[in-house]
Swiss-Prot record:
NCBIfam families: rplN_bact
SUPFAM superfamilies: Ribosomal protein L14
InterPro entries membership: Ribosomal_uL14, Ribosomal_uL14_bac-type, Ribosomal_uL14_CS, Ribosomal_uL14_sf
Disulfide topology: none
Alphabetically ordered keywords of this record: Ribonucleoprotein, Ribosomal protein, RNA-binding, rRNA-binding
UniProt protein name: Large ribosomal subunit protein uL14
GO BP annotations listed: translation
Signal peptide coordinates: none
Function: Binds to 23S rRNA. Forms part of two intersubunit bridges in the 70S ribosome.
Record-linked Pfam families: Ribosomal_L14 (PF00238)
Recorded GO MF terms: large ribosomal subunit rRNA binding; structural constituent of ribosome
Record's keyword annotation contains Lyase: no
Length: 122
């Protein structure tokens, strides 16, 4: 469960290491984001020669949460931390690699590219 001011790790090779959620997209009173939701993030920590710089604002999709996601069969998939993948204005991934597992809930038409790049889909 991600809300404003939440810190997330970055699960791609854009050069960003840590981001902070500054807005949950999808409605004026929307408070929380879960796996597969698009959020607006600010880069808080970045590698020196990465594609992105500290302080820049991007869209991102949440790929892992400590809260987890409940499946139709009753199982619950949780992770150790929260992670996101940075997106451009067209909601396409900026990076060319994804680190760590992602969930099957991302297998929508919007994020098939992320699922295909991921090393493991849970």
């Amino acid at each position: 469960m991600i809300q404003m001011q939440s810190r997330l790790d970055v699960a791609d090779n854009t050069g960003a290491k840590s981001v902070m959620c500054i807005k949950v997209l999808g409605g004026s009173k929307r408070r929380y984001a879960g796996i597969g939701d698009v959020i607006k993030v600010s880069i808080k920590d970045a590698a020196p020669r990465g594609r992105v710089k500290k302080g820049e604002v991007y869209n991102a999709v949440v790929v892992r949460t400590a809260k987890g996601v409940r499946r139709q069969d009753g199982s619950l998939v949780k992770f150790d931390g929260n992670a996101a993948v940075l997106l451009n204005a067209k909601l396409e991934p900026i990076g060319t690699r994804i680190f760590g597992p992602v969930t099957r809930e991302l297998r929508t038409e919007r994020f098939m590219k992320i699922v295909s790049l991921a090393p493991e889909v849970l």
